[in-house]
């Protein structure tokens, strides 16, 4: 019978590596510490009833390599051996996975722990710097990812290792500051009467913000898809869309600056995910860094902290692979999150 295990021993190779999102799941297999990961086509979560079926048909049926262990990054709380995912119907059951897929050892981590692991060693070709600050590259870092929601993860450097710190930073309060904010915020969709950062800084939040602008300006909204809003904004073809993305960048800068102070992230703040990559031209305009640095009495500190957009297409898998190769370099907690045959 598989059972929870708190061992910090390295996962045995070959290792199945998975990044499980709400819409897509991405998988690779790492055969040893020196090999490049073998990548598999993305799996649509809606196409399979369970994650076990997706792994079997999307990975194991397509290779002769049988993984001995697995490390999976999931969006959702990891409290026991039945782990429901936040944005899809799958439930991760490590014990069932061990019994049914021939895997000996399963470790499950938070999706933004994986993103944090990735930013420990991103090369310049996999990140785009915003602003002039360079920071301290062996200091703590933080990663924010506006996507389906707003993920936040810290990466603390201590005792010669990188320690990922998961959390729910995307649900901090986000309040109005400017005159325009006070016009718009009464029209932002709330959760139990509060506006959290995630109510604006994600895909649906972009639509919330666009709709609020349309209401205040007395115009008919014509777009319901975040991709349409960003496309029109970057093309300059719709005034409301342009303001939406500009304010999105401002609010993201405010929250990113807050997180930089929380983690004392002298090593940098990293923006991950498809939205950050798509609106990179807007983030490079002054509004983002101005909002990021506007943190009196600590403006001087924020000016020294670099900000980046992660451009690596598979950052979470890269982070998990780094951990799988050299676990001694990372302080990843396995308590209550690792199961062995």
Swiss-Prot record:
One of its GO terms (cellular component) is cytosol. Pfam families: Glucokinase. ATP binds at residues 18-23. InterPro entries: ATPase_NBD (IPR043129), Bacterial_glucokinase (IPR050201), Glucokinase (IPR003836). It is found in: Cytoplasm. Transmembrane segments: none annotated. SUPFAM superfamilies: Actin-like ATPase domain. One of its GO terms (biological process) is glycolytic process. Belongs to the bacterial glucokinase family. This is Glucokinase. It comes from Rhizobium etli (strain CIAT 652). The gene is glk.
